[in-house]
Design a protein with these regions (language model features):
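AMP-binding/adenylate-forming catalytic domain of the ANL superfamily
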Residues: 416-439
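AMP-binding/adenylate-forming catalytic core of the ANL superfamily
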Residues: 334-420
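Conserved AMP-binding/adenylate-forming
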Residues: 24-27, 31-74, 160, 359
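Conserved beta-loop-beta connector loops within the AMP-binding
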Residues: 277, 289-310, 339-340, 401-405, ...
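Conserved AMP-binding A3 loop
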Residues: 117-144
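Conserved AMP-binding/adenylation subdomain of ANL enzymes
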Residues: 140-156, 164-204
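Conserved ATP/PPi-binding loop(s) of AMP-dependent carboxylate-activating enzymes
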Residues: 283-287, 298-327, 358-360
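Gly/Ser/Thr-rich phosphate-binding loop
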Residues: 204-207, 216-276
């Protein structure tokens, strides 16, 4: 099935040799076919940094029905050790010598349950790598829901996100399977203003909040973004100031809610709603069903905060090597549907801070601190405290040396209830975020633990 799309869409990949891509995919497919004829179905590690090699390898593996594990070529040794122990691959496709020289495992009888499966890496905020198990069908269901929601037949994608991640992979997959066009460039190239001569009005571009923030710092790039058909925004929560800035440039932003497990977005705010002032996640795409449940699994009514729960045709089968034992996927996110049917996400349930018996949601505190314009970055966590149970702790990057905890505390004094205001403040040069802008919460907790000396913290006593 995968190879057939080449014949229908010969010039889909802009800026690259489509014939070269097609030939490489067919060559790799023939190599796999020879193994299959010998009764060998290899588990493949795919860690190509070259775009053409990655796409050709992915298509060949899918066409041959071999289980393929998408990997970040830039993982460090500790991460690769995790991956090799978990996957035990039989074949490695990579242009990185340090990866290629890894010892492969002898082929054993393959569990037929994982044939034709596509394993996509996800680490969440824990930093531990695991793989969500997808198929061509689950990815196709995501594309179909996208097409119906935006009422399109062809999807053109301008991709600046890594193809091994669901955020980049689905941009390629949408264009490839709908006879659309694909442009793939490193984000740094776009940020430098080296942009191909294309009409953005026909394209979707996907960004994470930190990328949007950096592009908006350049008025020329902000104006360029405003010409796109739609600018999808996901990967991490966006802050209100950033959304307002995008709105001021008339950027057709579409904040999304989704994850690796759902093959990207299942809820999206349409650009028209965003430009009219909405700041929520939008409405559910046709291929998904989202419910808000109580702790006792009762469906909650409108405007009641509960646990976000998902059913979707695009839902992963499980985390490799295990399968989910039910179709209902309960998330760690808390949210609610408003009167108009829009999904609003409050934050992660596991990130909720209980301090002195009161519930505090970090996103609210972070938004108040960001609104002061005194910090370049901030993350709020709960630090174990013998008196409060947990103490609200702000870890921040100041805009300049003159900014102190006292300065910020004064600026938010009338913006947050007393119990929501941070009791501890930790200043860093930068926060540990991945390329998507997601915080490594475990690392931040370790940093907070190291700051045990009260003299190192500005305590709000």
């Amino acid at each position: 099935m995968a190879l057939n799309y080449f014949n229908a869409n010969n010039d889909w990949f802009i800026g690259y040799g489509n014939k070269q891509l097609s030939r490489l995919a067919e060559q790799l497919y023939l190599e796999l076919s020879q193994l299959l004829q010998q009764g060998i179905t290899p588990k493949i590690i795919l860690a190509q940094s070259d775009t053409v090699a990655f796409i050709a390898s992915f298509i060949a593996a899918c066409a041959a029905g071999c289980p393929v594990f998408l990997c970040n070529p830039n993982w460090v040794n500790q991460e690769w050790q995790q991956v090799f122990e978990l996957v035990q691959p039989n074949l490695i496709w990579s242009d990185r010598p340090s990866v290629k020289q890894q010892q492969v495992y002898p082929v054993q009888t393959l569990n037929s349950q994982i044939q034709n499966h596509i394993m996509i890496p996800t680490g969440g905020s824990s930093g531990k790598i695991r793989f969500a198990t997808h198929t061509w069908d689950t990815l196709s269901a995501s594309v179909q829901g996208f097409k119906e929601y935006f009422q399109l037949d062809q999807i053109n994608s301008f991709c600046v996100l890594p193809l091994y991640h669901v955020s980049g992979l689905m941009q390629f997959f949408r264009s490839f399977t709908t006879n659309g066009k694909l442009i793939n460039l490193p984000f740094k190239t776009v940020e430098a203003g080296d942009i191909p001569d294309i009409d953005p009005t026909d394209f979707f571009i996907s960004l994470v909040p930190t990328q949007l923030q950096r592009l908006l710092q350049n008025p020329a790039l902000a104006n360029w973004l405003s010409k796109f058909k739609t600018v999808l925004l996901g990967g991490a929560p966006a802050w209100e100031e950033l959304l307002e800035q995008a709105r001021n440039y008339s950027i057709r932003l579409a904040p999304t809610y989704g994850m690796t497990e759902t093959a990207s977005q299942i809820v999206t705010l349409k650009p028209e709603d965003f430009l009219n002032g909405a700041n929520n996640c939008g409405k559910i795409l046709p291929h998904a069903k989202v419910s808000i449940l109580s702790p006792t699994n009762q469906i909650l009514e409108t405007n009641k905060i509960g646990i976000v729960t998902v059913e979707a045709k695009s839902l992963a089968l499980g985390y490799y090597p295990n399968l989910f034992n039910q179709e209902l996927f309960k998330l760690d996110d808390l949210g609610y549907f408003d009167d108009k049917g829009y999904l609003n996400i409050i934050g992660r349930n596991s990130n909720k801070i209980i301090t002195g018996g009161e519930n505090v949601y970090p996103t609210e505190v972070e938004a108040a601190i960001r609104a002061t314009n005194l910090v370049n970055d901030v993350c709020v966590i709960g630090k174990d405290d013998p008196i409060w149970g947990q103490a609200v702790t702000a870890i921040y990057v100041p805009c300049d040396k003159s900014v102190t905890p006292t300065t910020i505390k004064a600026a938010i004094a009338d913006k947050l209830s007393k119990f929501k205001q941070p009791k501890y403040w930790i200043q860093l040069e930068n926060l540990p975020r991945n390329y998507q802008g997601k915080i490594n919460c475990l690392q931040l907790l370790q940093i907070a633990t190291l700051h045990q000396n009260p003299s190192q913290l500005a305590s709000d006593s």
